[in-house]
Design a protein with these regions (language model features):
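A broadly conserved detector of short glycine/acidic/proline-rich loop/turn motifs that flank catalytic sites
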Residues: 36, 58-59, 118, 146, ...
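Cleft-lining beta-strand/loop regions that shape enzyme active-site pockets
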Residues: 1-185
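Polar, glycine-rich mid-to-C-terminal structural blocks
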Residues: 151, 157, 163-164, 168-170, ...
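Conserved functional hotspot residues or short segments at active or partner-binding sites
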Residues: 204-316
Length: 316
């Protein structure tokens, strides 16, 4: 927080940052001009092949639907017949952004999501209000994982419930609570959970166990199985269960330890001066042998499963 306060300032003014870079003995100074920085919600969009488009959406903000519409239009102009929508590790964001994005895919008048809580005021319904930009015969695959939450789950789950897309990956986070912010004074606010999100099949996005059911009266759905618009069976255990589950690969102890201790990043920083551009890098046997030697020379603390606990007990 202290660093952020020092960096912030009037737009157009200068600030000098001193940076300690890996393998550099002295600090490096950068003089920066303060400006409003706009971070795009779509980190990448393009054609994977002659038919399949790909869009990576990293969050849901005020501009998400505009960026999505522009990306879809460009892909459709390239004769896209199938789309991969990547929502992996997307933590969510604004509900309205999720609803507006669903408008681009779902027929006008369809129920998209609704909220239920203890009071009548907390009950709201959201329907598609426009003719979809994306043709109904265009195949859609949505990628999700355990890092997909909130608005990501609304988009993935609604597309799944309305049989508009196939969901692939890992079960999502399960964050489906509506929170209302009450300002206490100029510097403080109180955030209270007031309702839960439900998607078209009637499924609750929130995973059980996070919030006692008696806090939000009459909102608990006991059924664990629900059905899509076309009659497909889907799980209602919280979060979004993919139509096709992808198993996580299990890494070796040395691979896991190398990743945790930053050896991949450190190796790249050490050798990046050997190349003029990324295109020059070739993952051949030479570079793999060099990396292997680098790992073994790094004196890693590597333990088999349960070994560290055993050693701790032995030293007691």
């Amino acid at each position: 927080d202290d660093a952020a306060k020092l960096i912030r300032g009037k737009k157009g003014s200068q600030v000098v940052l001193s940076v300690h870079r890996f393998r550099e003995a002295d600090l490096i100074e950068f003089e920066l001009t303060r400006e409003d920085i706009k971070v795009k919600d779509i980190s990448y969009s393009g054609m994977l092949d002659n038919q399949t488009g790909y869009i990576r959406l990293t969050r849901f903000s005020r501009n998400s639907d505009k960026e999505m519409k522009k990306a879809l239009q460009e892909l459709l102009e390239n004769n896209m017949t199938g789309l991969v929508l990547d929502l992996r590790d997307n933590p969510g964001g604004l509900l309205n952004a999720a609803v507006n994005i669903l408008d681009l895919f779902i027929d006008k008048g369809e129920m998209l999501v609704w909220t239920e809580g203890k009071t009548q005021k907390s009950k709201r319904q959201y329907e598609s209000k426009t003719v979809p930009l994306v043709p109904n015969d265009l195949n859609i695959t949505v990628l999700v994982n355990q890092g997909s939450a909130s608005a990501s789950e609304i988009v993935a789950g609604t597309l799944q419930d309305l049989d508009r897309a196939v969901v692939v990956g890992r079960s999502t986070f399960g964050k489906g609570l509506v929170q209302t912010v009450f300002n206490l004074d100029k510097n403080r606010a109180l955030k209270i959970t007031t309702a839960k999100y439900y998607i078209p099949s009637g499924r609750l996005i929130q995973k059980p166990g996070y919030l006692p059911d008696d806090i939000l009266a009459d909102t608990t759905k006991q059924d664990s199985l629900f059905y899509t618009k076309g009659g497909r069976e889907v799980s209602g255990a919280g979060g979004i269960t993919p139509d096709h589950e992808v198993e996580l690969g299990s890494g070796s102890p040395i691979l896991s330890a190398s990743w945790r201790q930053g050896l991949f990043f450190n190796y790249v920083q050490k050798h990046k001066i050997d190349y003029n551009s990324f295109d020059e890098v070739e993952a051949d046997t030479t570079i793999m042998s060099q990396f292997e030697e680098y790992i073994y020379s790094s004196d890693l603390d590597i333990f088999m499963k349960g070994e560290s606990n055993y050693l701790d007990m032995k030293d007691m």
